[in-house]
Swiss-Prot record:
Its EC number is 2.1.3.2. Belongs to the aspartate/ornithine carbamoyltransferase superfamily. ATCase family. The gene is pyrB. This is Aspartate carbamoyltransferase catalytic subunit. SUPFAM superfamilies: Aspartate/ornithine carbamoyltransferase (SSF53671). Pathway: Pyrimidine metabolism; UMP biosynthesis via de novo pathway; (S)-dihydroorotate from bicarbonate: step 2/3. It catalyses: carbamoyl phosphate + L-aspartate = N-carbamoyl-L-aspartate + phosphate + H(+). It comes from Acidothermus cellulolyticus (strain ATCC 43068 / DSM 8971 / 11B).
Protein backbone atom coordinates (compact mmCIF):
# COMPACT_ATOMS: atom_id res chain seq x y z
CA UNK A 1 0.00 0.00 0.00
CA UNK A 2 1.34 3.42 -0.93
CA UNK A 3 2.08 5.95 1.81
CA UNK A 4 2.20 9.07 -0.35
CA UNK A 5 0.69 10.64 -3.46
CA UNK A 6 3.53 12.66 -4.96
CA UNK A 7 3.03 12.20 -8.69
CA UNK A 8 0.41 10.98 -11.13
CA UNK A 9 3.10 8.57 -12.26
CA UNK A 10 2.90 6.87 -8.85
CA UNK A 11 -0.52 5.50 -9.79
CA UNK A 12 -1.13 2.29 -11.69
CA UNK A 13 -4.35 1.97 -13.64
CA UNK A 14 -5.84 -0.08 -10.80
CA UNK A 15 -4.78 2.54 -8.23
CA UNK A 16 -6.40 5.33 -10.22
CA UNK A 17 -9.62 3.39 -10.78
CA UNK A 18 -9.81 2.54 -7.08
CA UNK A 19 -9.62 6.24 -6.21
CA UNK A 20 -12.24 7.17 -8.82
CA UNK A 21 -14.58 4.36 -7.74
CA UNK A 22 -14.18 5.32 -4.08
CA UNK A 23 -14.89 8.96 -4.94
CA UNK A 24 -18.06 7.92 -6.74
CA UNK A 25 -19.29 6.15 -3.61
CA UNK A 26 -18.37 9.09 -1.40
CA UNK A 27 -20.23 11.43 -3.77
CA UNK A 28 -23.46 9.99 -2.42
CA UNK A 29 -22.81 12.05 0.70
CA UNK A 30 -23.47 15.23 -1.24
CA UNK A 31 -27.19 14.44 -1.24
CA UNK A 32 -27.34 13.82 2.51
CA UNK A 33 -28.38 16.43 5.08
CA UNK A 34 -25.32 15.47 7.16
CA UNK A 35 -22.25 15.07 5.00
CA UNK A 36 -19.69 13.97 7.60
CA UNK A 37 -18.25 10.49 8.12
CA UNK A 38 -16.36 9.33 11.24
CA UNK A 39 -13.68 7.41 9.31
CA UNK A 40 -10.69 9.70 10.06
CA UNK A 41 -11.74 10.85 13.52
CA UNK A 42 -8.66 11.48 15.65
CA UNK A 43 -6.35 11.95 12.65
CA UNK A 44 -4.53 15.25 12.10
CA UNK A 45 -4.01 16.62 8.59
CA UNK A 46 -1.91 19.72 7.89
CA UNK A 47 -2.44 21.87 4.80
CA UNK A 48 1.07 23.25 4.24
CA UNK A 49 0.79 25.94 1.56
CA UNK A 50 3.75 28.01 0.39
CA UNK A 51 1.77 29.40 -2.57
CA UNK A 52 -1.60 31.14 -2.66
CA UNK A 53 -4.56 28.88 -3.32
CA UNK A 54 -8.32 29.10 -3.15
CA UNK A 55 -9.75 25.94 -4.69
CA UNK A 56 -7.15 23.37 -3.72
CA UNK A 57 -6.64 24.41 -0.09
CA UNK A 58 -10.33 24.79 0.68
CA UNK A 59 -11.09 21.57 -1.20
CA UNK A 60 -8.61 19.57 0.88
CA UNK A 61 -9.91 21.23 4.05
CA UNK A 62 -13.50 20.35 3.19
CA UNK A 63 -12.49 16.79 2.26
CA UNK A 64 -10.64 16.21 5.54
CA UNK A 65 -13.41 17.72 7.66
CA UNK A 66 -16.08 15.62 5.95
CA UNK A 67 -14.05 12.60 7.05
CA UNK A 68 -13.96 14.03 10.62
CA UNK A 69 -10.20 14.65 10.63
CA UNK A 70 -8.65 17.53 12.57
CA UNK A 71 -7.29 20.10 10.10
CA UNK A 72 -4.47 22.60 10.60
CA UNK A 73 -4.06 25.23 7.88
CA UNK A 74 -0.48 26.45 7.60
CA UNK A 75 0.39 29.44 5.43
CA UNK A 76 3.98 30.47 4.80
CA UNK A 77 2.92 34.08 5.23
CA UNK A 78 2.83 34.97 8.91
CA UNK A 79 4.76 31.85 9.96
CA UNK A 80 8.40 31.21 10.85
CA UNK A 81 9.00 30.57 7.14
CA UNK A 82 8.91 34.34 6.67
CA UNK A 83 11.77 34.48 9.19
CA UNK A 84 13.89 32.08 7.16
CA UNK A 85 12.84 28.68 8.51
CA UNK A 86 13.68 25.88 6.06
CA UNK A 87 11.23 23.31 4.74
CA UNK A 88 13.09 20.60 6.66
CA UNK A 89 12.77 22.42 9.98
CA UNK A 90 9.09 23.05 9.33
CA UNK A 91 8.69 19.35 8.54
CA UNK A 92 10.43 18.32 11.77
CA UNK A 93 8.13 20.66 13.71
CA UNK A 94 5.05 19.06 12.15
CA UNK A 95 6.50 15.61 12.82
CA UNK A 96 6.96 16.47 16.50
CA UNK A 97 3.28 17.42 16.67
CA UNK A 98 2.23 13.95 15.52
CA UNK A 99 0.80 14.88 12.15
CA UNK A 100 -0.78 11.98 10.25
CA UNK A 101 -0.70 13.58 6.79
CA UNK A 102 0.66 16.71 5.16
CA UNK A 103 -0.89 18.25 2.07
CA UNK A 104 1.80 20.46 0.56
CA UNK A 105 1.81 23.12 -2.14
CA UNK A 106 5.23 24.62 -2.82
CA UNK A 107 6.82 26.89 -5.40
CA UNK A 108 9.80 24.52 -5.78
CA UNK A 109 9.43 21.45 -7.98
CA UNK A 110 10.30 18.35 -5.95
CA UNK A 111 9.50 19.81 -2.52
CA UNK A 112 6.87 17.12 -1.70
CA UNK A 113 9.43 14.39 -2.45
CA UNK A 114 11.88 15.99 -0.03
CA UNK A 115 9.19 16.36 2.62
CA UNK A 116 8.27 12.67 2.31
CA UNK A 117 11.77 11.79 3.45
CA UNK A 118 11.46 13.83 6.64
CA UNK A 119 8.05 12.84 8.04
CA UNK A 120 6.51 9.51 9.00
CA UNK A 121 3.00 10.49 7.93
CA UNK A 122 1.57 10.54 4.43
CA UNK A 123 2.47 13.36 2.03
CA UNK A 124 0.11 14.53 -0.70
CA UNK A 125 1.36 16.80 -3.46
CA UNK A 126 -1.08 19.68 -3.94
CA UNK A 127 1.13 21.28 -6.59
CA UNK A 128 4.90 21.74 -6.71
CA UNK A 129 6.25 24.46 -8.98
CA UNK A 130 5.72 23.55 -12.63
CA UNK A 131 6.10 19.84 -11.85
CA UNK A 132 2.89 18.04 -10.85
CA UNK A 133 -0.61 18.33 -9.38
CA UNK A 134 -1.88 14.74 -9.16
CA UNK A 135 -5.21 15.32 -7.38
CA UNK A 136 -6.20 17.86 -10.04
CA UNK A 137 -5.61 15.20 -12.69
CA UNK A 138 -7.69 12.74 -10.67
CA UNK A 139 -10.63 15.11 -10.36
CA UNK A 140 -10.42 15.93 -14.07
CA UNK A 141 -10.48 12.22 -14.94
CA UNK A 142 -13.40 11.75 -12.54
CA UNK A 143 -15.30 14.58 -14.24
CA UNK A 144 -14.62 13.17 -17.72
CA UNK A 145 -15.75 9.72 -16.61
CA UNK A 146 -18.98 11.06 -15.10
CA UNK A 147 -19.95 12.88 -18.29
CA UNK A 148 -18.60 10.56 -20.97
CA UNK A 149 -19.05 7.19 -19.27
CA UNK A 150 -15.34 6.42 -19.12
CA UNK A 151 -11.87 7.68 -19.91
CA UNK A 152 -10.50 4.79 -21.97
CA UNK A 153 -10.38 5.73 -25.66
CA UNK A 154 -11.56 9.29 -25.09
CA UNK A 155 -9.78 12.09 -26.95
CA UNK A 156 -8.75 14.99 -24.75
CA UNK A 157 -7.13 18.25 -25.86
CA UNK A 158 -5.17 20.31 -23.33
CA UNK A 159 -4.77 23.85 -24.60
CA UNK A 160 -2.61 26.73 -23.40
CA UNK A 161 0.45 27.32 -21.28
CA UNK A 162 1.81 23.78 -21.16
CA UNK A 163 5.32 25.00 -20.35
CA UNK A 164 4.44 26.28 -16.87
CA UNK A 165 1.55 23.91 -16.12
CA UNK A 166 1.82 21.21 -13.45
CA UNK A 167 -1.81 20.39 -14.28
CA UNK A 168 -0.89 19.51 -17.86
CA UNK A 169 1.96 17.24 -16.78
CA UNK A 170 -0.16 15.29 -14.31
CA UNK A 171 -3.10 15.05 -16.71
CA UNK A 172 -1.01 13.74 -19.59
CA UNK A 173 0.39 11.01 -17.34
CA UNK A 174 -2.88 9.98 -15.67
CA UNK A 175 -5.09 10.18 -18.75
CA UNK A 176 -2.59 8.06 -20.67
CA UNK A 177 -2.59 5.53 -17.81
CA UNK A 178 -6.39 5.38 -18.05
CA UNK A 179 -6.32 4.87 -21.82
CA UNK A 180 -7.19 8.32 -23.15
CA UNK A 181 -5.63 9.89 -26.24
CA UNK A 182 -4.23 13.30 -25.28
CA UNK A 183 -3.25 16.14 -27.60
CA UNK A 184 -1.42 19.23 -26.35
CA UNK A 185 -2.22 22.44 -28.21
CA UNK A 186 -0.02 25.50 -27.71
CA UNK A 187 2.34 27.89 -29.47
CA UNK A 188 5.89 26.50 -29.68
CA UNK A 189 7.06 29.02 -27.07
CA UNK A 190 4.67 27.54 -24.48
CA UNK A 191 5.73 23.91 -24.91
CA UNK A 192 8.48 22.44 -22.70
CA UNK A 193 11.73 21.02 -24.00
CA UNK A 194 11.38 17.26 -24.41
CA UNK A 195 7.59 17.28 -24.86
CA UNK A 196 8.01 14.91 -27.81
CA UNK A 197 8.83 12.17 -25.30
CA UNK A 198 5.53 12.61 -23.43
CA UNK A 199 2.79 10.01 -24.11
CA UNK A 200 0.67 12.42 -26.17
CA UNK A 201 0.39 14.21 -29.51
CA UNK A 202 1.27 17.88 -30.03
CA UNK A 203 -0.42 20.44 -32.28
CA UNK A 204 0.06 24.15 -32.88
CA UNK A 205 -3.41 24.60 -34.44
CA UNK A 206 -6.51 24.49 -32.25
CA UNK A 207 -9.18 24.56 -34.96
CA UNK A 208 -8.03 21.29 -36.51
CA UNK A 209 -8.08 19.46 -33.17
CA UNK A 210 -11.46 20.51 -31.77
CA UNK A 211 -13.77 18.51 -34.11
CA UNK A 212 -12.16 15.27 -32.90
CA UNK A 213 -12.30 16.02 -29.14
CA UNK A 214 -14.45 14.44 -26.47
CA UNK A 215 -13.13 16.94 -23.91
CA UNK A 216 -11.09 20.12 -24.12
CA UNK A 217 -9.20 21.53 -21.15
CA UNK A 218 -8.14 25.17 -21.18
CA UNK A 219 -5.14 26.38 -19.18
CA UNK A 220 -4.49 29.96 -18.17
CA UNK A 221 -1.32 31.75 -19.17
CA UNK A 222 0.81 31.84 -16.00
CA UNK A 223 2.35 35.28 -16.31
CA UNK A 224 3.67 35.11 -12.74
CA UNK A 225 6.10 32.39 -13.83
CA UNK A 226 7.24 34.18 -16.98
CA UNK A 227 10.45 36.18 -17.20
CA UNK A 228 10.05 37.05 -20.90
CA UNK A 229 7.44 37.53 -23.63
CA UNK A 230 6.14 34.17 -24.87
CA UNK A 231 3.57 35.58 -27.34
CA UNK A 232 2.94 39.02 -28.90
CA UNK A 233 -0.22 40.13 -27.04
CA UNK A 234 -3.10 38.65 -25.06
CA UNK A 235 -5.42 39.52 -27.94
CA UNK A 236 -3.25 37.59 -30.39
CA UNK A 237 -3.05 34.62 -28.03
CA UNK A 238 -6.82 34.60 -27.61
CA UNK A 239 -7.34 34.84 -31.37
CA UNK A 240 -5.29 31.70 -31.98
CA UNK A 241 -5.81 29.62 -28.84
CA UNK A 242 -8.84 31.00 -27.00
CA UNK A 243 -12.08 29.00 -26.91
CA UNK A 244 -14.92 31.28 -28.00
CA UNK A 245 -18.46 30.55 -29.18
CA UNK A 246 -17.36 29.95 -32.77
CA UNK A 247 -14.77 27.38 -31.72
CA UNK A 248 -17.18 25.80 -29.25
CA UNK A 249 -19.41 25.03 -32.23
CA UNK A 250 -16.58 22.97 -33.76
CA UNK A 251 -16.72 20.47 -30.89
CA UNK A 252 -18.87 17.33 -31.12
CA UNK A 253 -22.22 17.75 -29.38
CA UNK A 254 -21.25 15.48 -26.50
CA UNK A 255 -17.90 17.17 -25.79
CA UNK A 256 -17.27 19.00 -22.52
CA UNK A 257 -15.10 21.98 -21.57
CA UNK A 258 -12.84 21.86 -18.49
CA UNK A 259 -10.62 24.41 -16.76
CA UNK A 260 -8.60 23.90 -13.55
CA UNK A 261 -9.02 27.56 -12.58
CA UNK A 262 -8.55 30.33 -12.01
CA UNK A 263 -9.94 31.39 -15.38
CA UNK A 264 -8.87 34.43 -17.36
CA UNK A 265 -12.14 35.18 -19.11
CA UNK A 266 -11.60 36.75 -22.48
CA UNK A 267 -8.11 35.24 -22.86
CA UNK A 268 -8.09 31.42 -22.94
CA UNK A 269 -11.87 31.11 -22.55
CA UNK A 270 -14.70 33.43 -23.53
CA UNK A 271 -17.31 34.29 -20.91
CA UNK A 272 -20.11 32.73 -22.96
CA UNK A 273 -18.18 29.46 -23.11
CA UNK A 274 -17.30 29.46 -19.40
CA UNK A 275 -20.98 29.92 -18.56
CA UNK A 276 -22.36 27.55 -21.21
CA UNK A 277 -24.00 24.16 -20.51
CA UNK A 278 -20.94 22.51 -22.07
CA UNK A 279 -18.71 23.91 -19.32
CA UNK A 280 -18.11 21.67 -16.29
CA UNK A 281 -15.79 24.08 -14.49
CA UNK A 282 -17.98 24.52 -11.40
CA UNK A 283 -18.63 20.78 -11.26
CA UNK A 284 -14.87 20.18 -11.25
CA UNK A 285 -14.68 22.08 -7.96
CA UNK A 286 -17.38 19.90 -6.39
CA UNK A 287 -15.77 16.75 -7.75
CA UNK A 288 -12.45 17.84 -6.27
CA UNK A 289 -13.82 17.45 -2.75
CA UNK A 290 -14.96 13.84 -3.19
CA UNK A 291 -11.80 12.84 -5.06
CA UNK A 292 -9.62 14.29 -2.30
CA UNK A 293 -11.80 12.56 0.29
CA UNK A 294 -11.06 9.30 -1.50
CA UNK A 295 -7.31 9.99 -1.56
CA UNK A 296 -7.22 10.84 2.15
CA UNK A 297 -9.38 7.85 3.03
CA UNK A 298 -7.25 5.37 1.11
CA UNK A 299 -3.87 6.78 2.15
CA UNK A 300 -4.78 6.90 5.81
CA UNK A 301 -6.23 3.40 5.70
CA UNK A 302 -9.80 3.93 6.82
CA UNK A 303 -11.06 0.62 8.14
CA UNK A 304 -14.80 1.32 8.31
CA UNK A 305 -17.13 1.28 5.31
CA UNK A 306 -17.22 4.81 3.92
CA UNK A 307 -21.00 4.77 3.62
CA UNK A 308 -23.41 3.26 6.11
CA UNK A 309 -26.34 1.06 5.23
CA UNK A 310 -27.28 -0.70 2.00
CA UNK A 311 -25.89 2.06 -0.17
CA UNK A 312 -22.42 1.08 0.98
CA UNK A 313 -22.67 -2.59 0.01
CA UNK A 314 -21.45 -2.28 -3.62
CA UNK A 315 -18.50 -0.24 -2.40
CA UNK A 316 -17.40 -2.54 0.39
CA UNK A 317 -14.60 -4.13 -1.59
CA UNK A 318 -13.35 -0.84 -3.02
CA UNK A 319 -13.37 1.09 0.23
CA UNK A 320 -12.24 -1.59 2.60
CA UNK A 321 -8.51 -1.12 2.69
CA UNK A 322 -6.39 1.37 0.81
CA UNK A 323 -3.87 0.93 -1.91
Amino acid sequence: MMRHLLSAGDLTRDDALLILDTAAELARLADRPIKKLPTLRGRTIVNLFYEDSTRTRTSFEAAAKRLSADVINFSAKGSSVSKGESLKDTALTLEAMGTDAVVIRHWASGAPHRLAGWVRGSVINAGDGTHEHPTQALLDAYTIRRHLGGVDGRRVAIVGDILHSRVARSNVTLLHTLGAEVTLVAPPTLLPVGVESWPCAVSYELDGVLPKCDAVMLLRVQRERMQAAFFPTSREYSRRYGLDAARLALLPEHAIVLHPGPMNRGVEIAAEVADSPRSVVVEQVANGVVVRMAVLYLLLGGGEPALAGRAAEPAAAAIGGGW
